Swiss-Prot record:
Binding site for ATP: 217-219, 226, 482, 534-537
Protein name (database record): Aspartate--tRNA ligase
Residues spanning the membrane: none
Originating gene: aspS
EC number: 6.1.1.12
Amino acid sequence: MRTEYCGQLRLSHVGQQVTLCGWVNRRRDLGSLIFIDMRDREGIVQVFFDPDRADALKLASELRNEFCIQVTGTVRARDEKNINRDMATGEIEVLASSLTIINRADVLPLDSNHVNTEEARLKYRYLDLRRPEMAQRLKTRAKITSLVRRFMDDHGFLDIETPMLTKATPEGARDYLVPSRVHKGKFYALPQSPQLFKQLLMMSGFDRYYQIVKCFRDEDLRADRQPEFTQIDVETSFMTAPQVREVMEALVRHLWLEVKGVDLGDFPVMTFAEAERRYGSDKPDLRNPMELTDVADLLRSVEFAVFAGPANDPKGRVAALCVPGGASLTRKQIDEYGNFVKIYGAKGLAYIKVNERAKGLEGINSPVAKFLNAEIIEAILDRTAAQDGDMIFFGADNKKIVADAMGALRLKVGKDLGLTDESKWAPLWVIDFPMFEDDGEGGLTAMHHPFTSPKDMTAAELKAAPENAVANAYDMVINGYEVGGGSVRIHNGDMQQTVFGILGINEEEQREKFGFLLDALKYGTPPHAGLAFGLDRLTMLLTGTDNIRDVIAFPKTTAAACLMTEAPSFANPAALAELSIQVVKKAENN
């Protein structure tokens, strides 16, 4: 039906007869001439109808936005004065000789001249996806997956599918359960990741595996999360953590070069401890120049409990954040930042406004200055390298609250004051995570997942001091987003059972949930390591949007609903009966 795409016509096509198929993006009726912007997935081209083709001109008068049409005509060069530099096809236009209206469109529920609500866009997603910016994002996503497949194939990886209907295993979030009709009362789980299957593939001898795969997690959603999402899943045998990072870094550098024309260069490597200390985050945005500075040792003897308490507590921390030019902040802005850090558990926000260092105490403005002598203040200014016109904010509490609150404040202030260089790309690897973290109930939980290997520890050493264990894990971070994470896996049965035990999984439960894995570990398991990238998040970064729903064709809302199909929906009672399922309504409180 077509010979060319609208958006691909150029000066090289001048004089050619072409047939185009697409939609009316806009129509302009000048009486004797009618112009339309005709759109398809590749872009927009101007088509015009003149009186010499009377039948086509008459039919064109009926056109409205989003009519689906076919046009045959001749490509012509525009006059110099009519060239549109804002359009890829702006140097040419098509003189229509024939027009076919394939399908008319009712009054549109979306307004192309105004910003539509996200709810409306999701309800009429098939219309929203016609917009050039949305089409471009999905084209970029398709290009990314194509580049990934070619790269992985060139590096000896095999694309192997793993099951969608599997067994529920504890991986951190709730599972989506699928009832079995054949096995009454039993349920499959949709996979949160192919983690165990890809490890089993390593045990099967397929030493380089990858898959672009759907994963499912029934968790509370945020703006950058979906209940179903896509991973670029990778696993290798007989490769060390640095070797895995080298190949995966090469993949991401390849994507940025091909999609953005940007060479990311070598990625710096930073430990978890350093990232938390300097940036208050395990996914630091290195485009922001500000860092946290420890000042507890300067404040242990002050008669100000807010500082002295955490400064003398082994689990406490006092950190300073020097904000270049921050002395210009108003009292209202400072109060707003004080309320902001309370979201993260901080009790407030102390500060020193540096007006003129040379004047000593008279050159600063601070509600806590009365608790600090000139010598201590000077030491703080020296350590933070504060200059005239800067602001120093303080966080004082337990280490986690200080990291969370001051790390978030660093990001917010950096954005608010334009200190974060939005034109840069800042990738890095974060390594050496704690293997376990406090679960809040006196126990431990795996920081990544229970199949991550400890670094340089035997099973006996791990059992004796799990709180000291460092995971042989690594995350890739770009511009403050964790785009991928992985680890060296446990390939020894004793070590795996030790980790399960530390996590409070008794032997009976181990056999029930992971018996197949423990059995497989008995038969010559190779050392293996892997990583998974979030395809949605990678695409988000490469297309310049901060909304993950913009890079998924048919996404869910933050309530995990599809407004277009109205999923989830109630099931047919007969279907439920066949599955031996009964829906029980909770009694309302009187």
